[in-house]
């Protein structure tokens, strides 16, 4: 069965309330929110999955043009893999320049990572495997996929999770997708661990394993509609990896247990004319969502301006 979801941005009063204070909002899994982006991931009542990651107010996006070409690679052969030390040095430099961040790239088999590499809450990036799993069962029509992936609508993602049976059944179906993509280590959370957020949004997913998954996702059965939706830009989320030409990506955001605000992105982007599977995590220096957006955009610019032989995705 399908769960058609109509984009409803919510009452104006709710948006204004969220815009006035971060504490009044939930979060991504709660509802991607912040004073700048009013997203249900930080809303509490809209868990990156209890509500809808609705955004308002334009995000801070750098005006500097990305160095990567927007044209797809014309090469029929993937570039030779760079010595891991070269790419490692690039990632280490980006981390050193941006503080409390993590980054990883992968070819699907191995990953090169730097900074915050321990598994942390996936927030709405977990919607990618959830929607792929739902699509496999025929429960995710085009409108549901677009709502949950392009616009990070939490209600749409919750509908997909429910269609999978919720709890252990949904977690197993979602985990099978992640494993098929190349990440056999991550365990999908089946139970709610933070009352204001969804179970799957609190899946502990490290940047290295996210990059591995993205390197193999195009070979995963039933993934294409979700990948297509990842390539459609939502103007309210135009920061970080989304600033790079042709990016296929999904973001997620929410409050950390330490009291900060985390923003995550994973995707396939073009660097130096070639596809690269990458995952990022950053915390805002002042606890504000908008600040974390700026950090993510700066990290993306640093990737685009670097010339090296990045690892090529397996798919």
Stretch-by-stretch model annotation:
Residues 2-68, 74, 78-95, 140, ...:
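Structured C-terminal helix/loop/strand segments within mature extracytoplasmic catalytic/sensor domains
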Residues 75-81, 113-120, 144-147, 157-165, ...:
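Second-shell loop/turn segments in exported
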Residues 96, 135-139, 149-157, 161-166, ...:
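Sec-exported extracytoplasmic/periplasmic mature domains
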Residues 96-119:
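Short, conserved catalytic-motif segment at the N-terminal edge
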Residues 106-108, 134, 148-153, 160-164, ...:
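Active-site-proximal beta-strand/loop segments in catalytic clefts of secreted hydrolases
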Residues 119-139, 148, 278:
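Active-site SXXK
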Residues 163-219:
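Mid-domain, small-residue-enriched loop/turn segments at the edges of structured enzyme/sensor domains
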Residues 212-255:
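Conserved active-site loop region of the serine DD-peptidase/beta-lactamase
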